């Protein structure tokens, strides 16, 4: 016999369905969601939706035990957790995560810094994307490189999602389309959506390259089932892009940190052994925080119950550490240009 849902579980499930339908009502709502979901790109689509519904400005979420044990950060008194849906053995439940803004740290806390796609990393990112996903049509800058990569990747990998979409088109505005129209609309919208989410997380100006009318067909995805497939495809494709970008940036920063540490050691004054011992005995162990900094969050493969250990991992943290046609906006020309995606 299935477990009866609690009032809170019913409330959160309803919130998930309502918010999923709401973000698909029009282009503005969908774009707004995409620009925030980039910060939670490792979470499943349903989790991204619930984070957006309860705390739209969240940038890094984890359960209390992760903040406490791994990051030595503490939940602020009175903070309200973000409820996410879990499923075990076919039964629904809830777990709660807290955003970085809901936490604080003492002297032993880890200094928290999300990765940033700074301009100095551009060439390395472009090279990594091309090595991972294949030759780009345009790599004039990081924005065009990301767009070219996503266009190729979505075309090559969208078929399974498209087949799922065809099974749930009934009772949606998509059912009035021919099969060819459905394929073109889905391919274009997933491509544009993946570009918007990925570029937003890289702090690139989406509005300079994509127009709002690129997302107008979102209104045809007017059922929970069709929106779920669109959202899942967008999340899956953007996640692959952002994992590669983040890995590249973190590797560069680790190498830079190694060089800095080596330089500091070479230039470090030699202290009297007795003075060093005395400082430790008096509670001024300058190496304590450095020992804590060796803690790293585990990377886990994506699965149905992926938790935030994979969401907030060491990679996110710094310590001292068929063709489709569409309009993409060219900022240099100050007008939309027709590009083959």
Give the predicted meaning of each segment.
Residues 308-312:
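Short cationic/low-complexity microdomains
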Residues 1-300, 304, 318-324, 329, ...:
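N-terminal accessory/interface modules of nucleic-acid-binding and processing proteins
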